[in-house]
Swiss-Prot record:
Compartment(s) where it occurs, according to its Swiss-Prot or TrEMBL record: Secreted
Binding site for Ca(2+): D82
Any one Gene Ontology cellular component term annotated for this protein: extracellular region
UniProt-annotated glycosylation sites, renumbered to this chain: N61
Key words of the record: Calcium, Disulfide bond, Glycoprotein, Hydrolase, Lipid degradation, Lipid metabolism, Metal-binding, Secreted, Signal, Virulence
Organism from which the protein derives: Arthroderma benhamiae (strain ATCC MYA-4681 / CBS 112371) (Trichophyton mentagrophytes)
Matching Gene3D superfamilies: Phospholipase A2 domain (1.20.90.10)
Protein name: Secretory phospholipase A2
Cofactor dependence: Ca(2+)
Family: Belongs to the phospholipase A2 family.
Organism classification: Eukaryota, Fungi, Dikarya, Ascomycota, Pezizomycotina
Length: 148
């Protein structure tokens, strides 16, 4: 009897000493930091780690558009754009102003990607930005689900 009481007390004290589970934070501040303030590589690292796990990390990459038009890898930019839309909706923040901000960030991400082409490859940067402009146009026209 004494042994079972000691074991029960020991087990309960171990449970009390264990850290309490913390609530996952994927609120507006975290979402905005990953979306608007972090580099695309920092965003991708968080996405690959699914950190924080309560964010909606799902993505269909560049939807029905090619993920890599003419070899330009737009996937990370498309994934961050999806993150903005999905988590904006999840947090009930998805207004037209918010959508425009996410879309503008998408264009900036694409242009930043295109800026890697310089010197003898500067023509690729020009071509890449033209594709970026097309992708931006379509998210503005069709991103709300109302495509002509």
């Amino acid at each position: 009897m004494k042994l079972s009481v000691l074991l029960a007390l020991g087990a309960s004290s171990l449970a009390a000493a264990a850290p309490a589970a913390t609530a996952c934070d994927c609120g507006a501040a975290v979402t905005d930091r990953l979306l608007f303030s972090s580099s695309i590589s920092t965003f991708q690292a968080a996405r690959n780690a699914l950190n924080p796990p309560c964010c909606d990390w799902s993505s269909d990459n560049c939807s029905s558009s090619p993920d890599k038009p003419r070899g330009y890898d737009f996937i990370p930019s498309c994934q961050r754009h999806d993150y903005g839309y999905r988590n904006g909706k999840r947090l009930n923040r998805f207004t037209e102003d918010y959508r425009k901000k996410v879309d503008d960030n998408f264009k900036a991400d694409l242009y930043n990607y295109c800026s890697q082409f310089s010197g003898l490859e500067s023509w690729k940067g020009v071509e890449c930005r033209r594709y970026a402009d097309i992708y931006y146009f379509f998210v503005r026209e069709c991103g709300d689900g109302d495509c002509p």
